[in-house]
Amino acid sequence: MPLVGAVAAPHSHLQLFTRPAENEKYKSDVQKGRNAMFALREQVERANADTILVIHDDHFVNFDFRCYPPFALLVGQEAKGSGVTDPDTIEQITGATYRKYEGKDAYQSAPSGIPQHMANWDEHKPYVYKVNTDLSVRLLKGLLEREFDVPFTSDGTMDGEEVLTTNFLNPKADKRVMLLFTNGYVPPLPWPKRCYRLGQAIRQILDEVDDRVLVLATGGMSHYPGTPLYGYVDEAFDKNVLALLASGKGSKLADFTPDDLMHSGNGELINWVITSGICGDVKCHVLDYIRLWHIGLGYVYWEL
């Protein structure tokens, strides 16, 4: 069977480091997040995939208001990205950066694709991921045949969040990738029922290939970046989603509306909905749910 598993994980850098002034409870929660990520890494290694299909919402890196598609496929030869993924290195960098800007009202924005707290450091690595171009093109054509008019691009950048999760879970970077960009930020969002059907179509296509493919959905859970609600977390919504997935009712995610996702701070959940469509109503393993000050973090995997 070519589809060898799926995982869903946050892409927030805050799951891997603590600020100098944080209390012991917060540090303990961050450590739980690290432990969950290491457990997911073991699942990725155990799956022994050839290719990772990364489903990730674009953070205004590849698209903007001139064109912000609900979905887009990368069909180029490689994907570039920058970022630091080692927790101890992140801890060192962020601690020094907080001290550097302590008491100041403004600080320099980061270059595209590099997390802001790493902008003035030379330690960040450039990553170049080899794309499984043949399979990406086959997926594109298969989706068009199934009446999903998915845009494509031959030039794609992996932003810092995408690099964080992808490289942490595959530190050897020894697997080719396929990149499906989504719009989890800019209303109107794609309808979850459409996302679920997209996942089903992807599964049909992957079932016809010989490549061993692992699906990686990044993002979430509840958070409200760049809004007055930043800091509020809809824990009840998050835990309901995880309960549905754990009970093998992932198809119920298709019943949500875009307003449900936006009001609960879960625009990025569309990546999980697509993955649920790929996996079907298979019970997933929920490793943990962690509430940090600004975000709910969910860690799950499917054995297929």
Question: Residue ranges of each PLM-predicted region?
Answer:
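Catalytic metal-binding/acid-base residues of hydrolase active sites
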Residues: 58-60, 221-222
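Flexible, D/E/H-enriched segments
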Residues: 1-49, 68-197, 208, 228-304
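Short HxH-centered metal-ligating active-site micro-motif
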Residues: 40, 47, 54-59, 205, ...
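Beta-strand elements within well-structured catalytic alpha/beta cores of enzymes
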Residues: 7, 50-56, 180, 211-219
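Short secondary-structure capping/turn micro-motifs that flank functional sites
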Residues: 60-61, 159
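A contiguous pocket-lining binding segment that forms or flanks enzyme active sites
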Residues: 199-204, 212-214, 218-230
